[in-house]
């Protein structure tokens, strides 16, 4: 396991009903293929040695003995292979015939797992031939030259490097209390399901929903293999399904109704799954003293004797990585944007009602953040059936304000029908510079922050005067980087954008531009989207254009949002985030969709390293600003509220994170 990833496979081999030699040879071909591709664990369909649809032939001693001999052949074949293989076969235990999954590696049987729930309804008659694991008592059987312990309890298999997995069989996952529930609560990271599920109209969609839900509920990687072409079509059809999920997300799936053997392979992020479990107190509380067996503690998986550092250098991530993890997929974009707006406006509406505020006061700069906050205010007032004139938009031109942003601010406020106030900060800030002895020609941090704090003072005093509340405009990305003036734009009475990352804000504003405003507002919003991000605290250039561009100073927001997502959501270390970023922004086979025309066409490794180090350094250094944030609604899975999702001491030391980032 490297960077927390393990490579798994689900195979659908060719099958002939009752021909154990042919079936075993087909399984061997798939195992060899998986070994060559670096797969660490592969699973096959239910009763894959014999074929599932043997029916009363399972009562024939000839078939049962031949099946056992075929497993011995398979053991011999795998003697020098590292891949762990899970195959299906009938196993006799005393007077019981069990439908089992057999886990093998290096020519050894690591364990045998009997099926718990036997379907005996409609087209299924498994109880005619097989007994349930619930009928079994702990015992030891001799099978395929091995002494193997059988138990009705769930069994956990543990690889050499600590990955834990369990096995369930077909109907088990359809039951009200699947064995995978107990397996996951006992520590299984992965669940392998050997299945023989026939095709019925609508069943495939239901199956995928079921597996996705089970993977999400148990926070596991779920690897499913169901038999296909070659099984008997006497009464039903087996279309073949190989599916791999990670915490509810479909990573890979086979072609349906294929007449050829198939295999799907994916890398599952076990580290991410474990992070999800650790942070989910409900999951932890559900864990009980479950009776289970831990098997295979001494067996190895691929490359376990190699130098770990060498392994990580050789590691290649084969799955795609979304460069914009905060942004909804195109098919869900409109619905997701609408949902986000509703969360924001409901949070603000409740605060307005609770405080009996007559007005809300918001600074309008003509930039993205204040635009989104204003749109939320408008929607909240409409929801509460309040007059939009109760929204007081204040534009406060300063030394760096450009005509473009000023005109956009005025135009947007006019078209939305709110109250407009214009208060220049130039005179007040100039007087302040004289009072504190600041040279106005020195454009340092004091020069910049004085302007931000003057604007906040104006907004706060206006809110007091008008019986209103100041609406904060700062976003999640700025909070992560500390790109806000302490007690300046950092402070408000309610921050509606506090958990919205910068990359998502463009899409939210664009959603409104396309669907929720008049033509003049639409034109203005589109120009705001195309405007470079800037606090405009430094005078414009000689042509009157924005000179101070945020992303030139702290780095591209699409990179920082990527870093933030994996750092905060899963607690990944810098080396893993860097590896994922390279895949997402450099090595991806997918066409990259730029968030903005201002984004670079591409990134190189040094650029990613540079801004990753900046992110780590600023994230730690700027925690003191996040420790005293105003209230604001949580919207997504990542938030920096000190009262909820992120509690970190302001004087924490970043040394170990920075050291790893420096060594990339």
Please provide the spans of the model-predicted regions:
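ATP/NTP-dependent adenylation/nucleotidyl-transfer catalytic domains that generate, transfer
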Residues: 6-7, 23, 161, 218-220, ...
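Enzyme catalytic cores with a strong preference for nitrogen-chemistry domains
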Residues: 1-361, 379-388, 420
């Amino acid at each position: 396991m490297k960077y927390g990833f393990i490579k798994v496979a689900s195979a659908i081999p060719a099958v002939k009903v009752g021909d154990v030699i042919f079936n075993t040879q087909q399984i061997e071909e798939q195992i060899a293929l998986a070994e060559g591709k670096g797969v660490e664990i592969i699973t096959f369909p239910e009763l894959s040695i014999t074929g599932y649809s043997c029916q009363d032939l399972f009562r024939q001693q000839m078939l049962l003995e031949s099946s056992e001999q075929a497993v011995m052949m398979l053991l011999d074949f795998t003697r020098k292979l590292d891949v762990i293989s899970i195959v299906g076969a009938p196993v006799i235990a005393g007077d019981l015939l069990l439908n089992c999954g057999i886990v093998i590696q290096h020519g050894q049987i690591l364990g045998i797992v009997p099926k718990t729930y036997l379907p005996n309804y409609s087209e299924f008659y498994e109880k005619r031939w097989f007994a349930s694991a619930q009928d079994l008592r702990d015992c030891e059987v001799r099978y395929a030259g091995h002494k193997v312990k059988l138990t009705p309890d769930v069994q956990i298999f543990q690889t050499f490097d600590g990955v834990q997995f369990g096995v369930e069989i077909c109907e088990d996952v359809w039951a009200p209390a699947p064995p995978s529930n107990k397996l996951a609560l006992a520590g299984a990271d992965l669940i392998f399901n050997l299945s023989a599920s026939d095709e019925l109209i609508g069943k495939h969609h239901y199956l995928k929903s079921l597996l996705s839900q089970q993977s999400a509920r148990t926070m596991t990687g779920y690897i499913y293999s169901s038999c296909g072409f070659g099984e008997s079509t006497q009464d039903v059809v087996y279309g073949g399904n190989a599916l791999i999920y990670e915490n509810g997300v479909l990573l890979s799936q086979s072609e349906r109704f294929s007449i050829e053997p198939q295999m799907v392979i994916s890398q599952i992020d076990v580290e991410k799954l474990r992070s999800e479990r650790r942070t989910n107190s409900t999951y932890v509380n559900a864990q009980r003293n479950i009776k289970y067996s831990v098997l295979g503690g001494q067996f190895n998986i691929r490359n376990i004797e190699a130098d770990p550092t060498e392994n990580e250098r050789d590691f290649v991530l084969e799955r795609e990585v979304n460069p914009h993890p905060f942004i909804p997929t195109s098919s869900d974009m409109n619905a997701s944007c609408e949902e986000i707006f509703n969360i924001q406006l409901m949070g603000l509406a409740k605060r307005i009602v609770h405080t009996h505020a007559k007005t809300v006061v918001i600074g309008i700069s003509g930039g993205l953040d204040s635009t989104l906050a204003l749109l939320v205010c408008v929607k909240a007032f409409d929801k509460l059936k309040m007059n939009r004139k109760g929204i007081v938009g204040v534009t406060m031109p300063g030394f760096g304000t450009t005509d473009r942003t000023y005109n956009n601010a005025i135009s947007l406020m006019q078209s939305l029908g709110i109250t407009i106030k214009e208060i220049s900060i130039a005179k007040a800030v100039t007087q302040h510079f004289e009072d504190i002895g600041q040279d106005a020609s020195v454009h340092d941090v004091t020069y910049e922050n004085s302007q931000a704090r003057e604007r906040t003072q104006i907004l706060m005093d206006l809110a007091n005067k008008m019986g209103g509340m100041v609406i904060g405009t700062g976003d999640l990305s700025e909070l992560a980087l500390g790109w806000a003036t302490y007690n300046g734009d950092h402070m408000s009475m309610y921050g509606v954008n506090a958990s919205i990352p910068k990359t998502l804000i463009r899409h939210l504003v664009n959603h409104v531009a396309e669907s929720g405003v008049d033509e003049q507002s639409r034109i203005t919003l589109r120009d705001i989207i195309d405007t470079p991000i800037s606090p405009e605290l430094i005078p414009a250039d000689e042509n009157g254009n924005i000179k101070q561009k945020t992303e030139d100073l702290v780095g591209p927001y699409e990179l920082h949002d990527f870093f933030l997502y994996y750092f905060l959501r899963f607690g990944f270390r810098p080396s893993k985030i860097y590896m994922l970023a390279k895949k997402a922004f450099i090595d991806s086979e997918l066409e990259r969709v730029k968030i903005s025309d201002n984004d670079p066409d591409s990134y190189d490794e040094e650029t990613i390293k540079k801004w990753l180090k900046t992110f780590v350094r600023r994230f730690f250094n700027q925690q003191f600003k996040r420790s005293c944030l105003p209230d604001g609604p949580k919207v997504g899975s990542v938030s920096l509220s000190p009262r909820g999702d992120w509690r970190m001491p302001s004087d924490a030391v970043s040394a170990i994170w920075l050291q790893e980032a420096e060594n990339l």
